[in-house]
């Protein structure tokens, strides 16, 4: 699982460490994913690490 308690953040780093969300969308890194989790009110979850 991914700890998103420190999010949302106003800006994400550009590093590419893809994670796959439960929406079958590939997020570029944990920061981008966690921001989306917060926006979804916690309905978005981690599918797996790596591309979808």
UniProtKB/Swiss-Prot annotation:
Glycans are attached at residue 41. Disulfide bonds join 4-34, 12-31, 20-52. SUPFAM superfamilies: Kazal-type serine protease inhibitors (SSF100895). The record marks 14-15 as: Reactive bond 3. Its main location: secreted. GO terms for cellular component: extracellular region. PROSITE patterns: KAZAL_1, KAZAL_2. SMART domains: KAZAL. CDD domains: KAZAL_FS. InterPro entries: Bifunctional_prot_inhibitor (IPR051597), Kazal_dom (IPR002350), Kazal_dom_sf (IPR036058), Prot_inh_Kazal-m (IPR001239). Keywords: Disulfide bond, Glycoprotein, Protease inhibitor, Repeat, Secreted, Serine protease inhibitor. Transmembrane segments: none annotated. Residues 2-52 form the Kazal-like domain. It is found in: Secreted. GO terms for molecular function: serine-type endopeptidase inhibitor activity. Avian ovomucoid consists of three homologous, tandem Kazal family inhibitory domains. This is Ovomucoid. It comes from Coturnix delegorguei. The lineage of its organism: Eukaryota, Metazoa, Chordata, Craniata, Vertebrata.
């Amino acid at each position: 699982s991914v700890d998103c308690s420190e999010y949302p953040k106003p800006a994400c780093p550009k590093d590419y460490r893809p994670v796959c969300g439960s929406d079958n969308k590939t997020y570029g890194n944990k920061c981008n994913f966690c921001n989306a989790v917060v926006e979804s009110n916690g309905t978005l979850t981690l599918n797996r690490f790596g591309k979808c």
